Regions:
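Short beta-strand->loop
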Residues: 82-93, 169, 177-191
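Secondary-structure junction motif
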Residues: 72, 96, 102-103, 115-137
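A ligand-binding cleft/hinge motif common to bilobed small-molecule-binding domains
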Residues: 70-80, 151-181
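A late-sequence structural motif
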Residues: 126, 182-202
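Alpha-helical "hinge/linker" immediately C-terminal to small N-terminal DNA-binding modules
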Residues: 1-12, 100
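Central regulatory/effector-binding core of bacterial HTH transcription factors
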Residues: 13-76
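Short helix-loop capping/hinge motifs at secondary-structure junctions, enriched
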Residues: 99-109, 188, 202
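Short beta-strand-to-loop elements that line the ligand-binding cleft
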Residues: 45-53, 119-120, 140-150
């Protein structure tokens, strides 16, 4: 609900087609649930999503091809022609398959350095936060076996192997809420991210 009120305040009356840039974090639960709730109240509007990389979405928004971007906000960018509005904050967590040996290990933190990892891509903000968390924990940086931002790929890889994944909490909430994957009880310090909307300024 907050998403659409924020958009209406900037764009005016919502009608016709609303074009959305969807970053990976928003695609599995946040945006689908928001779209379903919105369309129940506004059945005459068409919503179009674009799942391109962040840089491409920004270029499309500057060109007027996208109305807004939803997902993790970039905290280290100074782009005067764009503005952002946070909806909430969340931390990253470590996911693994149910019955993974680390869930029974007396000190799972000690095993993180030698684990096989599914990680965000090297240039993704989430990857930078994760690296900083490992430095804070006094551990060597995790080395990716697979790099991907696709939630379905992460789920399939974890369910079929002993790999670990570091993701934002909401990105895989369906899997954790429905018992498809488990959370390793090792907190990742200083990985809080702001999740929200990015618009053209003005």
């Amino acid at each position: 609900e907050n998403i659409w009120s924020d958009i209406a305040a900037r764009r005016g009356v919502l009608e016709g087609t609303v074009r959305i840039g969807a970053l990976p974090l928003s695609r599995t639960r946040l945006l689908p649930s928001a779209i379903a709730a919105f369309l129940a109240q506004h059945p005459g509007i068409t919503l179009m999503t674009n799942e391109s990389p962040y840089e491409s979405l920004v270029a499309d928004m500057r060109a007027g091809n996208i109305d807004f971007i939803i997902g993790a906000l970039r905290q280290d960018e100074d782009l005067p022609d764009l503005c952002s509005e946070a909806l909430f904050e969340e931390d990253m967590l470590i996911l693994l398959r149910n019955n993974h040996p680390l869930l029974r290990h007396p000190d799972p933190r000690s095993q993180l350095a030698t684990a096989q990892w599914v990680l965000p891509r090297a240039n993704a903000p989430a990857r930078n936060l994760l690296d900083k968390a490992f430095v804070t924990l006094g551990l060597p940086l995790p080395q990716p076996t697979v790099e991907t931002g696709d939630a379905a790929m992460v789920r399939g890889l974890l369910q079929g192997s002993d790999m670990l994944a570091a993701v934002s909490a909401s990105q895989m909430r369906f899997e954790t809420d429905n018992g498809l994957l488990s959370v390793l009880p090792v907190p990742l310090p200083d990985t809080t991210r702001r999740i929200g909307l990015t618009f053209r300024a003005g």
